[in-house]
């Protein structure tokens, strides 16, 4: 979860699998690819786009992608969470922490970030039997009660947290400069994955040299994380149809 390689690899792999299946079914696939996704799917879309540009993906022609409402700047997401008195989806924080614990063998990550009993309880809460809302019911949405006071105060200054900041940087996508068309979307009233994260990511990409003719941004006016889904789908279908 919010790990670049394990997110981007399956995007490319499923395209390869679909291409092989099309040959088996005698379906003519022209190789043109459009990528779209929302929330974590937005991150996956941008990650897949990046990997397709930077790796050999013979047989595929990426026409455009449309990542929506993802947390592309992971350090920015951490700063957003830490700045809030409360956050209504605390299981997201546990999800990222457990992912990085597994990928990086970060044995202290749960106790570094979370207070008890949450640091002990989190692995069992993510055993696959509970929904996100059910996990939330076993956590607190008050950040000062969920998170360790030390990390809230010192994540940017104490070297013990360097491994976290390095992981955030490695897996963030805000320094990617796309050369194939990308249309970003985000709801302006989104407080689940903050709108500003997409704005900052877009501005970073432009500052680093992305062409406004390649990279564009569509604000979904007054849309929350939930209410932005339908207008995004409607617009992206029309946009992709025009690019075919």
Give residue ranges: language-model regions.
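Alpha-helix capping and helix-loop boundary segments enriched in small/acidic/polar residues
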Residues: 1-6, 36-40, 155, 224-227
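Alpha/beta-hydrolase active-site loop
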Residues: 2-24
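Short beta-strand/loop motif that positions the catalytic acidic residue
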Residues: 35, 178, 183-190
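Short alpha-helix in the alpha/beta-hydrolase fold that links the catalytic acid
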Residues: 48, 180-182, 194-206
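Acidic catalytic loop of the alpha/beta-hydrolase fold
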Residues: 74, 188-194
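C-terminal catalytic histidine-bearing segment of alpha/beta-hydrolase fold enzymes
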Residues: 79, 160, 165-167, 192, ...
């Amino acid at each position: 979860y919010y790990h670049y390689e394990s997110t981007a690899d399956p995007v490319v792999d499923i395209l390869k699998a679909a291409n092989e299946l099309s040959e088996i079914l005698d379906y003519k696939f022209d190789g043109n690819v459009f990528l779209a996704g929302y929330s974590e799917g937005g991150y996956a879309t941008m990650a897949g786009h990046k990997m397709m540009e930077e790796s050999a993906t013979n047989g595929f022609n990426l026409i455009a992608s449309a990542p929506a409402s993802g947390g592309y700047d992971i350090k920015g997401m951490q700063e957003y969470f830490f700045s809030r008195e409360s956050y209504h989806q605390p299981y997201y924080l546990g999800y990222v922490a457990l992912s990085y614990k597994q990928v990086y063998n970060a044995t202290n990550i749960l106790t570094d970030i979370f207070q008890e009993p949450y640091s002990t309880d989190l692995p069992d809460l993510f055993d696959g039997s509970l929904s996100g809302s059910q996990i939330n019911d076993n956590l607190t949405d008050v950040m000062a009660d969920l998170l360790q006071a030390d990390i809230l105060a010192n994540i940017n200054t104490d070297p013990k947290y360097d491994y976290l900041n390095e992981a955030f940087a490695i897996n963030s996508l805000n320094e990617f400069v796309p050369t194939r068309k990308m249309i970003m979307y985000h709801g302006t009233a989104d407080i689940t994955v903050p709108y500003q994260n997409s704005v900052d990511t877009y501005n970073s990409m432009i500052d680093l040299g992305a062409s406004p003719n390649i990279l564009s941004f569509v604000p979904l006016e007054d849309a929350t994380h939930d209410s932005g889904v339908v207008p995004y789908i409607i617009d992206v279908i029309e946009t992709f149809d025009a690019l075919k």
